[in-house]
Each structure stands twice: as C-alpha cells, then as structure tokens.
C-alpha cells in the first residue's frame, strides 16, 4: 500500500516471514520515542517507580512538543496516568516525566534506552530522550515492539483505543490512539503509531488470535488508512500461513 518499508514476524521468536527494505534505517516519526518508552516501562516493571507514586512534572517535561498529555510544569500527577498517556499516544511530556521519576534524570533514562537498543541488536545512536534524530529500520521497530509486548507495564494500557486522564486542577485530557487496528482487527493488543510530514505514516502492530501472535511494522505509508490497510493485510497473511502450517502438522500426525 505504498509503504517505504515493512516486516511481518512471529512475535514469539521474531522470525520474519515477509519483509520489504526491513533493514534500511529511515525516519519513523514519533516512533523514535519507543526506546525511551521501553526503558520507562521496564523500569516500572522492575520497581524503580510504583504506578501509584505521585510525580512532579518538570519544566523540561512540560516543554516537550508533539503528541502530549498537556502536562503543566510543577503539576503533580500519579505515575499510572502518565503511563497510560505514554503508552496510548506516545505522549512526550508523560514519557519524559516518567523517565525522570524512574531513573533520576532524562540523561540516565536515555543511557538505559541506548543500552537496551544494544541488547536488542539495534545499532542506532540514541543520544536524546525523544530520539529526535534517530533513524530506525522496520527490523529495529519489530525488536522494540516485541520487547514492549513482554512488559506488563506496557500491556496494561496498550489495548486501549480511547480513554483519558484527570489533572489535579480539574482539567481532563482525552487520549485517542491512532492505531485503528485496535478497533478493526480482532486480537490487536498494540503497539504504537507515529507520523510526520517527512516520515509518512508508520506503525508497529501486535495481534494475537488463538495460539498465534504476529507483529508487523509499516514505515512511510502515504496516509493513516493505507498504514492500517497494509498492516491488516500483513497480519491476515500471517494468520493464513499459520493455519496452513497447523493443518500440515495435523495431517502429518494423522499419517504417522
């Protein structure tokens, strides 16, 4: 559907069954925030920050542009609300506030994110928390998506399509995911979408049906609809192939 790159893989083992320019690093819009989000979610999983903890939003966090949770400097908000905004819409201010709360500073979280990228085999330079200048490949995004789907902190909110958070001053921020597959594809449990004028429409998608889970990445689709269409087609291809393999195994058992 006119994408610049794509990959489809079994989520458990990461074995790719379809790929197009999957190793080529390119602009991926807001998906450059995924390494920071992974570090934050895993930090919460490891107890560095309790979801019930109160977090004071710094001036630096409140200044972050792009998708945001409309946080104000010095606002006090629970970590769970920040996590919801971070996971659902990749809210940069929420990710930044969580990073500072869990790791003590944005720099420390950035270093952790870089270390996780290395562990995942992603050779990208990640020198700034939002990853503004980081280019990632479809394979890189697949590795990040697989890791995020193993994080309980992430999956607590990754299936939500529409929700919201409440601020202490009485304001409410609506959170609407751009991942249409959460509504249209049975078993979709995440992962994230992002876009920009130069990157096009990008996304990482995880779908589980029966005993199979597939993850796919689409980079550079011309619009949101074609991103969803490409992802749906890839996912459907994966499940069709899985059913053929399962049937072949059954036939083999019967023959034996």
Where are these predicted regions, by residue range?
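Penicillin-recognizing serine hydrolase domain
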Residues: 1-5, 105-255
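Active-site-adjacent loops and short helices of periplasmic peptidoglycan-processing enzymes
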Residues: 1-139, 143, 149-152
